[in-house]
């Protein structure tokens, strides 16, 4: 199996730009992961390198033909919402969320009027809906 390309979309950025498309490699809210180390569960010798500075760990379960059976993200900051495999491009698209950004607390200085507060509530609702949708898909 060739090493797949990982394409990540941060749902929070997509929400702010009203663009939640996951079907395009040209999505402006997507980025390609770099500085990737691959760890395989087989008899190949493991590269000697320092693994202590890794921030995120993706566990990708696949068969010998490259069909993905599951993806898991171990991270203190990010939550994996969903993934999709694009076989022709040998690409795995990941949909992640880093945090609920829409802070609705009254001490937040940039809520100046009712429209900006309504926009924050809307953003928070979209984020929560995405989280719930990802939980429903897992069942």
From Swiss-Prot:
Protein name: Autophagy-related protein 31
Family: Belongs to the ATG31 family.
Coiled-coil ranges per UniProt: none
Main localization of the protein described in the UniProt heading: other
Lineage: Eukaryota, Fungi, Dikarya, Ascomycota, Saccharomycotina
Function: Plays a role in starvation-induced autophagy. Involved in mitophagy. Functions with ATG17 and ATG29 at the preautophagosomal structure (PAS) in order to form normal autophagosomes under starvation conditions.
UniProt keyword annotations, A-Z: Autophagy, Protein transport, Transport
Subcellular location: Preautophagosomal structure
Binding partners and assembly: Forms a stable complex with ATG17 and ATG29. Interacts directly with ATG29. The ATG17-ATG29-ATG31 complex interacts with the ATG1-ATG13 complex. Note=The interaction with the ATG1-ATG13 complex is induced by starvation.
Record flagged with keyword Disulfide bond: no
Origin superkingdom: Eukaryota
Further comment found in the protein's record: Kluyveromyces marxianus proteins are shorter in length and have a more ordered secondary structure than their S.cerevisiae counterparts, which might contribute to the superior thermotolerance and solubility. K.marxianus could be therefore useful as a new model organism for further elucidation of the molecular details of autophagy.
Disruption phenotype: Mislocalizes ATG8 in the cytosol, when ATG11 is also deleted.
Organism, scientific name: Kluyveromyces marxianus (strain DMKU3-1042 / BCC 29191 / NBRC 104275) (Yeast)
Matches recorded under InterPro entries: Atg31
């Amino acid at each position: 199996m060739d090493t797949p390309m990982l394409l990540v979309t941060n749902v929070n950025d997509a929400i702010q730009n009203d663009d939640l498309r996951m079907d395009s490699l040209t999505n402006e809210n997507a980025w390609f992961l770099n500085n990737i180390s691959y760890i395989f569960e087989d008899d190949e010798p493991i590269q000697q390198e320092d693994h202590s500075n890794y921030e995120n760990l993706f566990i990708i379960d696949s068969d010998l033909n490259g069909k993905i059976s599951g993806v898991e993200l171990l991270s203190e900051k990010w939550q994996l919402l969903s993934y999709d495999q694009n076989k022709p491009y040998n690409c795995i698209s990941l949909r992640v969320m880093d945090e609920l950004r829409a802070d609705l607390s009254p001490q937040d200085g940039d809520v100046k009027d009712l429209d900006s507060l309504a926009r924050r509530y809307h953003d928070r609702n979209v984020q929560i809906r995405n989280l719930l949708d990802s939980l429903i898909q897992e069942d």
